[in-house]
């Protein structure tokens, strides 16, 4: 039985990943660098040392990953002045979980300022027991540490805690932590690796809600 739910944010709650994917080129161009194919996919869902490792892999050990990350986030502040669209089924899922007295946490690789901006724009902050940002950790997703802290905030065992994720790195983190991990794909479909890791794949948050109601989750 599910006793708590952990939400990723970008690409799961809000339709933001498509926008982030377009921000790499201007961010890198401002630093005299060009976008390299596969960077967005490799970096998606990461933060901190995990993202730095990705950037060094693409741009070499002598690159300044923090400068690139800061340039990317500067582009994000401009791009997200208007609230991004909510994913279909988000409001209904949250309402159901609240009615069932199932606590919820947001655990995102994004900066806390970004998490607060999106949630406050939609007046959603009060629905969650805690908000956890990847910038709080040296190792973010695919390391499970962020989800383990979320479970601690919920007061639930990972085996009875649902992780909702769209990214490969998020699914890897959920599986590594022993969580009930459901992938709701956004930009990238599930591949063989993901199918070997997740508990279930759902096409939308509406399907997650349906599975909870029928007891399949």
Question: Where are the predicted features?
Answer:
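Short, flexible loop segments at the rims of nucleotide/cofactor-binding pockets, characterized by
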Residues: 80-85, 109, 178-179
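Residue-level marker of regulatory loop/turn positions in helix-turn-helix DNA-binding domains and
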Residues: 86, 107, 139
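N-terminal helical cap/lid subdomain that shapes the substrate entry/recognition surface
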Residues: 2-100
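Structural motif
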Residues: 42, 107-109, 164
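Asp-based, Mg2+/Mn2+-dependent phosphohydrolase catalytic module
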Residues: 1-3, 95-98, 111-217
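Functionally critical, cavity-lining and gating residues within the transmembrane helices
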Residues: 48, 108, 112
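Conserved G/P- and acidic residue-centered "switch" motifs that form tight phosphate/ATP-binding loops
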Residues: 8, 12, 108, 166
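Residue-level detector of anion-binding/catalytic polar loops
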Residues: 34, 103, 180
